[in-house]
Amino acid sequence: MGCIVGIDYGSKRTGLATTDPQQIIASSLASLPTTEVLSYLKTYCKEVNVEAFVVGQPLQKDGTPSAIETEIQHFIGQLKAAFSECAIARYDERYTSKIAAQTLLESGIKKKQRRDKSILDRISATLLLQSYLDFKSNML
């Protein structure tokens, strides 16, 4: 069984998370400029057996797609072209950034560190992926 990589896509920065090979626990992987994500994933996939990607689906409160969805669809097209052997799933990422920010606040991390968007991106990607894993395990 291979790992699953979670992707919290952003216009400027993208957070990445990964699972253990048994696909039970999600862990933070990286936060990168979005322009570097595909290159990073190509290198990562040479080192680690990745079987699927979960890309966050940013929905509005009323369930309609967020404005960034067009960019995400373009990115998914690139992801499919580069990793045709991997499955790509979408998962609702509503509130992951707010939960990540609250987690940072409650963890006692200093304000200066909480302002580091890369930490927030990684936590959001991890929350997205863990939520997906929990959903998937409840479906069995």
Please describe what each predicted stretch is.
Residues G2-I4, S11-L140:
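Phosphate- and other anionic-substrate recognition elements at nucleic-acid/protein interfaces
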